């Protein structure tokens, strides 16, 4: 029995499903989860000593690669002065100033510890600011596991939940909790316009993944985002971009800088923690002024602005500002996507791939999908076989057909070539 299997058997005795986040259990692809012992650069090693080229990157944060010496040093130096204070630090100000500088739509920002906290708090603030209750979200977009957002959500819920019904995607969420959440089709402008026409003056906020990375990778159309911005402005609703995944991953200024659309609020995470638990929400000063202790919208957190997370995140944010960083990252990610498409074409396998910044999506279907409905038509059985063939050849992809992949600054040409060599074998199998 492998060491990975031994650990999985042991974990299931004390941890539900043997994992602390569902997709890690390999339920959708089958087989034994890999228990990771260490990682460096673009590589990870499991409990059996197997090395993998890593395309999960901790689900996005490791944009400069695992265990970057500057990030490690910053955390070690900070840890020597204690791990947490429960009081303000100067480093929190440095982090806030850096975020506001890099994302101009954010005039003020509040640090939290997870993406779920960021989106949950942003929606509460939007409701408090507008005095309205109704929220619009979109099919396949995942905004964390707050109750009101678990309706036709993406990420692991595409594997575990019934997504055919306009009802909570998780047991334990009362239907009454989600009655103020309206779910519309991603990239459907007409449906969005109709919703605003029917609910004029009732909509508190629209929240959207500008590049949806939790139903694989689906880009918002320019027309969709433009209409969203115009409708929110006209009706006084708050436009929230969930950039927990895309922030500093798609571009230095996030997906909003790539598209040239300015939201009222932005949620960030992943990269801003450099691998540590950290997230943030921020936006217009007049909206943020409603947040406690200035206003009546309450939000708090014992570990918000944690010194270790801030040290890792701030160092990462400074590293990614190096000249040419995003040009190279984008080029390498595109090279990977194009190489995978060519390998599939040569093997006669229906397949498509897309890439934006340091994110990529692979789809076992003809053509890149533009909506939740199109994503669900992918050949998941074929993906599962491909996933295991790649794993056997030392390439670690997301263990789900509905998750985006991530490239780091450490994925050089030799690593991409090794990946494509493995893919050619996998497609031919």
Swiss-Prot record:
<dbReference type="GO" id="GO:0006782">
    <property type="term" value="P:protoporphyrinogen IX biosynthetic process"/>
</dbReference>
<comment type="subunit">
    <text>Homodimer.</text>
</comment>
<protein>
    <recommendedName>
        <fullName>Glutamate-1-semialdehyde 2,1-aminomutase</fullName>
        <ecNumber>5.4.3.8</ecNumber>
    </recommendedName>
</protein>
<dbReference type="InterPro" id="IPR015421">
    <property type="entry name" value="PyrdxlP-dep_Trfase_major"/>
</dbReference>
<dbReference type="GO" id="GO:0008483">
    <property type="term" value="F:transaminase activity"/>
</dbReference>
<dbReference type="GO" id="GO:0030170">
    <property type="term" value="F:pyridoxal phosphate binding"/>
</dbReference>
<dbReference type="InterPro" id="IPR005814">
    <property type="entry name" value="Aminotrans_3"/>
</dbReference>
<feature type="modified residue" description="N6-(pyridoxal phosphate)lysine">
    <location>
        <position position="270"/>
    </location>
</feature>
<keyword id="KW-0413">Isomerase</keyword>
<keyword id="KW-0963">Cytoplasm</keyword>
<dbReference type="InterPro" id="IPR015424">
    <property type="entry name" value="PyrdxlP-dep_Trfase"/>
</dbReference>
<dbReference type="Pfam" id="PF00202">
    <property type="entry name" value="Aminotran_3"/>
</dbReference>
<keyword id="KW-0663">Pyridoxal phosphate</keyword>
<dbReference type="InterPro" id="IPR015422">
    <property type="entry name" value="PyrdxlP-dep_Trfase_small"/>
</dbReference>
<dbReference type="GO" id="GO:0005737">
    <property type="term" value="C:cytoplasm"/>
</dbReference>
<comment type="pathway">
    <text>Porphyrin-containing compound metabolism; protoporphyrin-IX biosynthesis; 5-aminolevulinate from L-glutamyl-tRNA(Glu): step 2/2.</text>
</comment>
<comment type="similarity">
    <text>Belongs to the class-III pyridoxal-phosphate-dependent aminotransferase family. HemL subfamily.</text>
</comment>
<dbReference type="InterPro" id="IPR049704">
    <property type="entry name" value="Aminotrans_3_PPA_site"/>
</dbReference>
<dbReference type="GO" id="GO:0042286">
    <property type="term" value="F:glutamate-1-semialdehyde 2,1-aminomutase activity"/>
</dbReference>
<keyword id="KW-0627">Porphyrin biosynthesis</keyword>
<dbReference type="InterPro" id="IPR004639">
    <property type="entry name" value="4pyrrol_synth_GluAld_NH2Trfase"/>
</dbReference>
């Amino acid at each position: 029995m492998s060491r990975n299997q031994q650990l999985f058997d042991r974990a299931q005795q004390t941890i539900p499903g043997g994992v602390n986040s569902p997709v890690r259990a390999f339920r959708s692809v089958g087989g034994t989860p890999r228990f990771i012992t260490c990682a460096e650069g673009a590589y990870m090693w499991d409990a059996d000593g197997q090395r993998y080229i890593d395309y999960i990157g901790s689900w996005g944060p490791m944009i400069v690669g695992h265990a970057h010496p500057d990030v490690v040093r910053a955390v070690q130096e900070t840890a020597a002065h204690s791990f947490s204070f429960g009081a303000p630090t100067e480093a929190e100000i440095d982090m806030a100033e850096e975020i506001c500088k890099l994302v101009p739509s954010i005039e003020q920002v509040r640090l939290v510890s997870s993406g779920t906290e960021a989106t949950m708090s942003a929606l509460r603030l939007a409701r408090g600011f507008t005095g309205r209750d109704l929220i619009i979200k979109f099919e396949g977009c995942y905004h964390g596991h707050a109750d009101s957002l678990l309706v036709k959500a993406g990420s692991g819920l595409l594997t575990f939940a019934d997504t055919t019904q306009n009802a909570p995607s998780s047991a334990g969420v009362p239907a009454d909790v989600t009655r103020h959440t309206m779910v519309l089709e991603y990239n459907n402008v007409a449906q969005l316009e109709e919703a605003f026409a029917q609910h004029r003056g009732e909509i508190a906020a629209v929240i959207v993944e500008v590049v949806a990375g939790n139903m694989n990778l689906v880009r918002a159309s320019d027309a969709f985002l433009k209409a969203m911005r115009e409708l929110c402005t006209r009706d006084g609703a708050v436009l929230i971009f969930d950039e927990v995944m895309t922030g500093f991953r798609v571009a230095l200024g996030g997906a909003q800088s790539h598209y040239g659309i300015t939201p009222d609020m932005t949620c960030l995470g992943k990269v801003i923690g450099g691998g540590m638990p950290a997230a943030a929400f921020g936006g217009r000063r007049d909206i943020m002024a409603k947040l406690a202790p200035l206003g009546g919208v309450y939000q708090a957190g014992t570990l918000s602005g944690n010194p270790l997370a801030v040290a890792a995140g701030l160092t990462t944010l400074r590293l990614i500002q190096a000249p040419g960083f995003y040009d190279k990252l984008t080029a390498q990610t595109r090279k990977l996507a194009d190489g995978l498409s060519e390998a599939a074409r040569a093997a006669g396998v229906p397949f498509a791939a897309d890439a934006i910044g340091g994110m990529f999506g692979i789809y076992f279907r003809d053509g890149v999908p533009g909506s939740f409905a199109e994503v669900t038509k992918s050949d998941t059985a074929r993906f599962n076989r491909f996933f295991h063939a790649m794993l056997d050849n030392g390439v670690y992809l997301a263990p789900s057909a509905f998750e985006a992949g991530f490239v780091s600054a450490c994925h050089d040409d030799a690593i991409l070539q090794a990946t494509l060599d493995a893919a050619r074998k996998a497609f031919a199998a």
